[in-house]
Amino acid sequence: FVNQHLCGSHLVEALYLVCGERGFFYTPKAGIVEQCCAGVCSLYQLENYCN
């Protein structure tokens, strides 16, 4: 997994992959869209959004 742009459904799919059964907490206020779609994010950064 390399740092990459993740937007829309790709971002959601990546969160499901990373978080698995834990699920994830998604809110635009958290900045995940700015971080991962406008910029790039890593696997480690995605894990911050897991429950």
Curated annotation (Swiss-Prot):
This is Insulin. Disulfide bonds join C7-C37, C19-C50, C36-C41. It is found in: Secreted. Keywords: Carbohydrate metabolism, Disulfide bond, Glucose metabolism, Hormone, Secreted. GO terms for biological process: cellular response to oxygen-containing compound; glucose homeostasis; glucose metabolic process; positive regulation of protein secretion. It comes from Capra hircus. Belongs to the insulin family. Its main location: secreted. GO terms for cellular component: extracellular space. Heterodimer of a B chain and an A chain linked by two disulfide bonds. One of its GO terms (molecular function) is hormone activity. The keyword Glycoprotein does not apply. Insulin decreases blood glucose concentration. It increases cell permeability to monosaccharides, amino acids and fatty acids. It accelerates glycolysis, the pentose phosphate cycle, and glycogen synthesis in liver.
